[in-house]
Structures are given as C-alpha cells and as structure tokens.
Amino acid sequence: GLGDVYKRQVQFWADKETGCSKNFWLRSTGWYLMALVDCIALCSEQLYEHYRALVDIFRESIRGVLAYRAEDGLFYQVIDHPEAEGNYTETSGSAMIAYSLLKGVRIGVLDAEKYLPIALDVFEKLAANKLRAEEDGVVRLTDICWVAGLGPDKNPQRDGSVAYYLSEPKKSDDSKGVGPFIMAYSEYLRAKQA
C-alpha cells in the first residue's frame, strides 16, 4: 500500500530501515503541525473518521514536541539534540508550534486548561526572546534559519545530519519566520480576548 512507499529508503539521507531522516528539524515539524491543525479545522462531520485520525495524530505530535521544549520556553533547531554545539532555539519553528498550540486550543482539539497556558507562554517567550530592538530603533525578528532541506543527491551536504542543520545561516526578518510569527500572534490575540 501507500504506507510502504513512505517506509522505503529512496533518498541517500534516509534511514535504510525506516526511510526517515536521521534527525528532527524544527521547521519541518512546525510545518507538519500547522498542516494538521489547519486540516482539522477544515474537516466536516462527513469526514469524521479521518477527522478523528488527524486529531489523534495532532495530539500525539504535540505531546511529543513539548517534551523537547528548551529552558527558554522555545524549541531547538534540531529538536532532539539540545546538547549539540551550536544548536539554538529557532524562531520560525517555535512560532509554528505556538500557532499550532493556540489554534488547537481554539478549535477544541487540545484541552484549554492544560494547553492554553503552555501556548500563551511559548508565544510570549518567543516575543520576549526573539524580537530585538536595534540601536536605530528598528525591531527585528531574529534567529530564523534561513534555509535548510534534504538532498538532492547532487548536494550531499544536505544529508539531514545535526552538523548540516546547524551549518545553515540564521537571518533576521526572513518571511519563513515572520509569517508564522504573525499567524501565531493573531491566534494569541484571539486567545487573550476570549
């Protein structure tokens, strides 16, 4: 079946048994969580079986990622290797997680009593730690991984290793961070007004 396609090792960077990448890159996890919560929000009762499956996957994924929350309240560029030299709490993926948590609470698939305080805290820590005023008064959104990815085999540097993910440059005000930050902020405002 289709599931077998995802288990096969088809890329040079993939684990030969699982077909998965060796490590967990934060922004890819953030994209996944955002896609899940946005699809859940669009599902109708006619798709109830699929809706329940998506909700279960979303909840499990949220529990999993929260286990790796950093001391500053955000999430590392390589999620499960906080000890790696040069690893840092990355802005775009942390914003995506904040958005996913806040929207998950708002649409009722995450328990508000348990997850709303966490969701609010992630966003507040994101704003406090990653919005920085420059000497000229311009406020910048910092520590955004500029670009990362896997493959192709013509570019073996993009091998999914911790070293690779941490070698990509950080930028300020990159749209891949600003967009999710604005989305998270809109959910934050809705939560605060509720």
Summary of predicted features, one role per range:
Residues 11-13:
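Zinc-dependent metallopeptidase catalytic helix centered on the HExxH motif
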